[in-house]
Amino acid sequence: MKLGAFSISLSVKDINASKQFYENLGFTVLAGSLDKNYLIMKNENSLIGLFQGMFDNNILTFNPGWDENGNNIESFNDIREIQEELKNKGIKIENEIDKTSSGPASFKITDPDGNVVLIDQHR
């Protein structure tokens, strides 16, 4: 199963303070907008997302079809294939995608310790 780029999505209280903190650690802004209350930041191959007011807890995020630079990769598993494989393994999908759809979509699963995992395909 190819899940694509991995990042941790952090729920932050003050996006400007968080941006400054992670810039001090060597991260640079890759995508997003302060006006929209989210930034994707990168340090070498590490990605973090800063999200203010969008969700309550931190989320592990995978982006099928993207590499860590947000570039499309040729060979990837479509999110609907990933969803079906996880369902067949008995993993509960919190917001199932219509398997007859195509293109961008997302769903969430929760690991045994309550950590939310977002599978978020943008293409």
Report the location of each language-model feature.
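Conserved acetyl-CoA-binding loop of GNAT-fold acetyltransferases
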Residues: 23-30, 91
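Loop/turn position at the start of each blade in beta-propeller repeats
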Residues: 3, 36, 102-104
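N-terminal beta-strand motif that seeds the catalytic metal site of vicinal oxygen chelate
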Residues: 1-19, 122-123
